[in-house]
Amino acid sequence: MNDETTPANKNPEKAELRCGWTTGACATAATKAALTALITGEFPDPVGIILPKGEVPYFQLAYEGLGEGYAMAGIVKDAGDDPDVTHGATIISTVYPAPPGTGIIFRAGEGVGTVTREGLAIPPPGEAAINPVPRRMMTEICEAICAEYGLPADLVITISVPGGEEIAQKTWNPRLGIIGGISILGTTGVVHPFSCSAWIHSIHRGIDVARAAGQKHVLGATGSTSEDAAQALYNLPDFAILDMGDFAGGVLKYLREHPIDRLTIAGGFAKLTKLAQGALDLHSSRSQVDKGFLWQIAERAGAPADMKERILLANTAMEVLELTQSIGIDIAGPIALEARQTALKTLRGAPVEVEIIVTDRKGNILARV
């Protein structure tokens, strides 16, 4: 058995990136191993599963346990080179028979969250935070194994993640109303490095929860400083705060199809300059501030011609902001207006009122439109 995993790549630009496996794939493999041992007394190791797109990965077992009427198997999650907070966590499945006719029942063990709010794919109250695709994968594999041995698929499957409650504090589960641990996630079973699909999934689920709660106003911020500034104005409930970060497009495109009355986007000057330029992914590796664009904004705001070269040669957007502020020129307001136009264009007429708040590094509001 192998109970270790290689740390996620800390320098992805210097090496070919490795894909990894979702918590859902690990839970499915652990469940297959546990059920097989429950029936036969032997744990398959490694254990292979078929993923939704046909891949057949094999997983080494990090934990085995066989007792009277139950079996347990654990797999250490390898997220490849994705910066995933669950990388290295042990996903444990405990399987035991359920009363005849009950089918397959999922339960949250230690470190796996419980859903408490409406709007998520798993209905509350008290349901284990195991998403639909992992549930289906585990159900199908259990039904196939039971059919092979001529047994009814009446089982209780408890998924546990030691330390999961602490890991969950690094996620948005508490704001989504998922308490006590992490979620068991995945749609393909594969984690693609830096694809950010889990982050965008969190954004979508946050919007779903807010809509289900009847919330009319949500906030997406690029970071904690701008979030705090907006919250000082509105004091929105935690479930109204979306995990936006750099993914303005993830918020806007989902709201296009699932509208909420009002959206406030709050961010630092540089991030919202990129949104004003039309970028929807605001990460520094995927969009850059265009100094020429900033000069156009400054020129329209009244900046003198002799400032053009200084703006074009500036190292950062904040340097441009400070240059214009030093002569009493406001470019934060025009940037906010342009950012709002990008947001409205992306929403394509969806009934969402958009507000933009631009802050400086200290959280002072520079513009609000």
Curated annotation (Swiss-Prot):
Pathway: Cofactor biosynthesis; adenosylcobalamin biosynthesis; cob(II)yrinate a,c-diamide from sirohydrochlorin (anaerobic route): step 6/10. It is an enzyme of class 2 (transferase). HAMAP family: CbiD. Belongs to the CbiD family. The lineage of its organism: Bacteria, Pseudomonadati, Pseudomonadota, Alphaproteobacteria, Hyphomicrobiales. Keywords: Cobalamin biosynthesis, Methyltransferase, S-adenosyl-L-methionine, Transferase. It comes from Brucella melitensis biotype 1 (strain ATCC 23456 / CCUG 17765 / NCTC 10094 / 16M). One of its GO terms (biological process) is methylation. Gene3D superfamilies: CbiD-like. It holds the Pfam family CbiD. InterPro entries: CbiD (IPR002748), CbiD_sf (IPR036074). SUPFAM superfamilies: CbiD-like (SSF111342). It comes from the Bacteria. This is Cobalt-precorrin-5B C(1)-methyltransferase.
